[in-house]
Regions:
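N-terminal low-complexity, acidic/polar interaction/targeting segments
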Residues: 2-168
Length: 168
């Protein structure tokens, strides 16, 4: 998987798109739902970038066998697009319902403009962090992005007995 920064993003192929990635240790499958609470500035910036335009983000699982990318966990190469519902602010947190959608494969990663910092209980604002990189990386983001392509939907049915056997 190739890794780019915001100043050297390649031209996209027709079937590719750039998608913000939310890397977690939990699964979200197509048609699943999960309540989310966001408090980190990088993911607040991500939500600012997508919510107003009704765009999805990519829910991916961190891959512990890979080295970190600019201080961020590298994900496995398959994820699920997420549509956001019931978005609300609660104090300094953003809450929403994540709805799993189409599966995608990550072809390349775009690293964040800054390494994430681990703050105690008081986080800086997104604007304060953007000021740290905006001159060097005007197209940069605090979060990881992926150059992705959609995976075709699965077609057909599987017998329940066979499915249970495969899972056991």
């Amino acid at each position: 998987m190739e890794i780019f920064n915001s100043s050297n993003i390649p031209n996209l192929k027709e079937e590719e798109a750039i998608v913000p990635l939310f890397t977690l240790d939990t699964f979200l499958l197509p048609e699943d739902q999960m309540m989310m609470r966001v408090f980190e500035p990088r993911y607040k910036q991500m939500l600012d970038d997508i919510v107003l335009d009704g765009l999805p983000y990519g829910h991916v699982i961190s891959n512990p066998s890979m080295p970190e990318l600019n201080g961020v966990s590298v994900p496995y190469d398959v994820g699920v697009l997420v549509e956001i519902d019931q978005f609300q602010e609660q104090g300094s947190n953003l809450l929403y319902l994540a709805n799993g959608g189409r599966r995608f494969r990550i072809n390349s990663l775009i690293e964040p403009a800054l390494e994430p910092e681990f703050f105690n209980s008081i986080f800086p604002s997104v604007d304060e962090l953007v000021e740290e990189y905006i001159e060097e990386f005007p197209e940069g983001k605090l979060y990881v992005r992926g150059i992705v392509e959609l995976i075709p939907d699965l077609i057909g049915e599987i017998d329940t007995k066979r499915w249970n056997y495969l899972l056991s």
